[in-house]
Amino acid sequence: DTSQGGRSRLEWVYSSIPNGGPDLVVIEFGGNDVLRGFEPKITQKNIEAMVMFLKNKKTKVLLTGMQSPPNMGSNYAQEFNAIYPNLAQKHNIPFYPFFLEGVGGVPSLNQKDGIHPNEEGVKVIVNKIGPYVVDLLFGK
């Protein structure tokens, strides 16, 4: 989905979770935005709105980054790739630099579309990001 789709559903999804909402939300948006050539400023605006909504609800947030493929051009990639670390710093939230670390571009870990992780790819992602999630939920 796009960051706009996530933003438009966040309040509804949040309110449907019992006991006042989730303890932690992992924000992982932007991949479809970049593939559709959305302006990075639009993606940033949508993700920042989600971060602010969750912070206002006192919900822990883990922001995960995406990266622009090289075919989008260096200027686009530079602007897009900066969204995530900039927002994490601005809002003082934990940041996992690249959601698809170790999976992106590895054919054996992706579905036939070459973009979305397959079952083995998901295992790699969970093993890499899992410690961040556990630490945020339960501390070290």
Task: Identify the function of each model-found stretch.
Residues D1-S3:
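Short beta->alpha junction loops
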Residues S8-K140:
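Alpha-helical cap/lid subdomain in secreted, periplasmic
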